[in-house]
Amino acid sequence: MRQNNLIAKINQEQLRDDVPEFRAGDTVRVHARIVEGSRERIQLFEGVVIKRKGAGIQATYTVRKISNGVGVERIFPLHSPRVAKIDVIRQGRVRRAKLYYLRELNGKAARIPERRRN
């Protein structure tokens, strides 16, 4: 077996099949596993997906939320075992793949309208 095929096969085995379909503009709740000493707990991070990047095992997504008036962004690997689950709260209607402009907006201007489901 060639090395490229072997790497592709190993990567294919590591992909998660429980990842919901979401895209930039959607509001998601990420259940992240946090290890503190010998304890492991679940930490929730809810915000707007401002970008998705990459494909396959190296795919990532960035979630932005406002915490105490300060914008916080976290980058999560899509297929990471450290992410317990991803809940899609609402689907946003945007016309861009990367929503970096949200960093400059605040208050009501930073809201994203909900995408209508047919």
Swiss-Prot record:
Keywords linked to the UniProt accession: Ribonucleoprotein, Ribosomal protein
Alphabetical GO biological process terms: translation
GO cellular component: cytosolic large ribosomal subunit
One Pfam family, short name: Ribosomal_L19
Gene Ontology molecular function: any one: structural constituent of ribosome
Classification via InterPro entries: Ribosomal_bL19 (IPR001857), Ribosomal_bL19_CS (IPR018257), Ribosomal_bL19_sf (IPR038657), Translation_prot_SH3-like_sf (IPR008991)
Domain of life: Bacteria
Similarity comment: Belongs to the bacterial ribosomal protein bL19 family.
Free-text function comment from the UniProt entry: This protein is located at the 30S-50S ribosomal subunit interface and may play a role in the structure and function of the aminoacyl-tRNA binding site.
Protein name per the record: Large ribosomal subunit protein bL19
Organism: Levilactobacillus brevis (strain ATCC 367 / BCRC 12310 / CIP 105137 / JCM 1170 / LMG 11437 / NCIMB 947 / NCTC 947) (Lactobacillus brevis)
